[in-house]
């Protein structure tokens, strides 16, 4: 056991999907995994291990934001030996050519979080996805005929921000806003692991367009399939 995860040694697979919502973790386990067993209920942050196409896979809720995902990624890697981590979640688009229901593969992540400034003593660090996971996820998405975008996302430290300045980030090519990827990529790099964020565009920040619950669920399923295929095709 670790501080925030109640699993025993060996109960978590080396490949894991990371939704923010623990109920999404339960949904993924029940919908996509065979023989799924719950290994964690600490703080209501559900975690499950099962198989997908015969390959062992885990799924763990992380909560929202850099501090929360950092806790789970640190413990999954250091206490349980996880090697491949794929975030699956939603984001808000800030580019006119990115539409709701599109799937974004986050090649890199800008951020206003001070996490990396603290780690690197005031200097900037460029959190980046694992190339092999990114390439495989892109190939799977193309095979499925999905509306894919690949590029930089912005990891925000605040959900409610009175002065977000999205126009500047958009001018520099950032595709969308979310709250976890920069931390995931930084920690994966620190420990020599592989990481990727696969994100569904749930709303458009500039236009105000939003998806319905049904639309989000349909696109979410496609996103999960991309993430699962990327995980098993790249081994541990």
Curated annotation (Swiss-Prot):
Phosphate binds at residues 20, 24, 43, 87-90. InterPro entries: DeoD-type, Nucleoside_phosphorylase_CS, Nucleoside_phosphorylase_d, Nucleoside_phosphorylase_sf. Gene3D superfamilies: Nucleoside phosphorylase domain. The record marks 216 as: Important for catalytic activity. A purine D-ribonucleoside binds at residues 4, 178-180, 202-203. Its EC number is 2.4.2.1. Pfam families: PNP_UDP_1. HAMAP family: Pur_nucleosid_phosp. Homohexamer; trimer of homodimers. Belongs to the PNP/UDP phosphorylase family. This is Purine nucleoside phosphorylase DeoD-type. It comes from Geobacillus kaustophilus (strain HTA426).
């Amino acid at each position: 056991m670790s501080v925030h995860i109640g699993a025993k040694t060996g109960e978590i697979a080396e490949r894991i999907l990371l939704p923010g919502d623990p109920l999404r973790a339960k949904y993924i386990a029940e919908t996509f995994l065979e023989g799924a067993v719950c290994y964690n209920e600490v703080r209501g942050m559900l975690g499950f291990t099962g198989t997908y196409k015969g390959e062992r896979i885990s799924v763990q809720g992380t909560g929202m934001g850099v501090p929360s995902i950092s806790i789970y990624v640190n413990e999954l890697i250091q206490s349980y030996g996880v090697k491949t981590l794929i975030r699956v979640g939603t984001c808000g688009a800030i580019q006119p050519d990115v539409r709701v229901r599109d799937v974004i593969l986050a090649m890199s992540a800008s951020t206003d979080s001070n996490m990396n400034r603290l780690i690197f003593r005031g200097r900037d660090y460029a959190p980046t996805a694992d190339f092999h996971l990114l390439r495989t996820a892109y190939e799977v998405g193309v095979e499925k005929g999905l509306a894919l975008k690949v590029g930089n996302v912005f990891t925000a430290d605040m959900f409610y921000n009175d002065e977000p300045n999205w126009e500047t980030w958009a001018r520099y090519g950032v595709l969308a806003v979310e709250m976890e990827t920069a931390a995931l990529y930084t920690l994966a790099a620190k420990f020599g692991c592989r990481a990727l964020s696969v994100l569904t565009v749930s709303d458009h920040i500039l236009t105000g367009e939003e998806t319905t619950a049904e639309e989000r669920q349909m696109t979410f399923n496609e996103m999960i399939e991309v993430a699962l295929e990327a995980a098993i095709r790249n081994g541990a």
